[in-house]
Amino acid sequence: MCNIVVFLLTLTLFLFSGLSNTAFARVQYEPLKPKFGARVWDQKMIKNIKIEVDGSCSRRAPGRRRPPNRPPKPCTKP
């Protein structure tokens, strides 16, 4: 019984001492060009980033409908 009390007391001590340390460990975000309206600048930069993604070569998962009577398209990816 005494071991459980000591364990819980130690656990709560570590919990509350760790909460204050996490505030110091966080890295604050700073935009590359801090200026008036920096948030708007960040949103514009995010909108300008475009990623090209090709289609998948995987087949569709089986569903409730019957599959069509045509063969699947061949994959053209290397």
UniProtKB/Swiss-Prot annotation:
Motif SxS motif essential for MIK2 binding location, chain numbering: 56-58
Role according to the record: Brassicaceae-specific phytocytokine (plant endogenous peptide released into the apoplast) perceived by MIK2 in a BAK1/SERK3 and SERK4 coreceptors-dependent manner, that modulates various physiological and antimicrobial processes including growth prevention and reactive oxygen species (ROS) response regulation.
Signal peptide (from-to): 1-25
Compartments where located: Cell membrane; Secreted, Extracellular space, Apoplast
Protein family (similarity comment): Belongs to the serine rich endogenous peptide (SCOOP) phytocytokine family.
Keyword annotations of the record: Apoplast, Cell membrane, Cleavage on pair of basic residues, Membrane, Secreted, Signal
Protein name: Serine rich endogenous peptide 19
Coarse class of the protein's main subcellular location: membrane
Subunit structure: Interacts with MIK2 (via extracellular leucine-rich repeat domain); this interaction triggers the formation of complex between MIK2 and the BAK1/SERK3 and SERK4 coreceptors, and subsequent BAK1 activation by phosphorylation.
Species whose genome carries this gene: Arabidopsis thaliana
GO molecular function: LRR domain binding; receptor serine/threonine kinase binding
Compositional bias (Pro residues): 69-78
The keyword Acetylation is annotated on this UniProt entry: no
Segments for region (Disordered): 57-78
GO CC, any one term: apoplast
UniProt keyword Cell membrane, yes or no: yes
Motif (SCOOP motif): 50-64
